[in-house]
């Protein structure tokens, strides 16, 4: 249906079942629903992604998904705050049919969603949350996302010797993935 304001859907996955009865990977939901997704690697990124995610959602007129994992969702840390945004004025949609889930309306919205995929990919390619870091040893390339990136960097406090692609925003940044593949042996 799209949105007329910012909307972030947060899914908290539980890898290794620390506090639930099953493991899930909600990244598949982002891919399946064709909407952008964020995956923070630390508390500051979680804060920044929520802050920027609301603005991005409002700009594109679609919800965005944010994937958290147990270790991050159950943690606390100080964060550097950003300026508070002014409250938007409430208004009714010019076309309320957009929010009525009937096949005729859904097909129109689906077409719009498909047309926006290039915009979502471009946003991901240019996102500061996706970062390629070169390394001197090209025998291995590492792709890390979310808190897994923090675990990687804990093992390399002086910097990783291998090229690393940190993923924080989806759809996957194909140009950066290709750069990693072409760089490594």
Which residues fall in each region the model found?
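Thiamine diphosphate
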Residues: 1-58
């Amino acid at each position: 249906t799209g949105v007329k304001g910012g909307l972030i859907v947060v899914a908290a996955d539980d890898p290794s079942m620390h506090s639930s009865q099953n493991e899930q990977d909600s990244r598949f939901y982002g891919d399946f629903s064709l909407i952008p997704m964020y995956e923070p690697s630390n508390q500051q990124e979680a804060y920044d992604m929520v802050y920027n995610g609301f603005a991005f959602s409002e700009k594109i007129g679609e919800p965005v998904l944010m994937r958290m994992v147990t270790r991050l969702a159950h943690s606390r840390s100080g964060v550097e705050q950003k300026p508070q945004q002014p409250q938007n004025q409430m208004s009714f949609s010019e076309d309320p049919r957009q929010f009525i889930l009937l096949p005729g309306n859904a097909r129109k919205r689906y077409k719009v969603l498909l047309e926006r995929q290039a915009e979502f990919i471009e946003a991901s390619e240019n996102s500061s949350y996706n970062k390629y870091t070169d390394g001197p040893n090209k025998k291995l390339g590492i792709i890390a996302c979310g808190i897994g990136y923090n675990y990687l960097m804990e093992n390399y406090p002086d910097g990783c010797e291998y090229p690393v692609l940190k993923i924080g925003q989806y759809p996957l940044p194909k140009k950066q993935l290709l750069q990693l593949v072409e760089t490594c042996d």
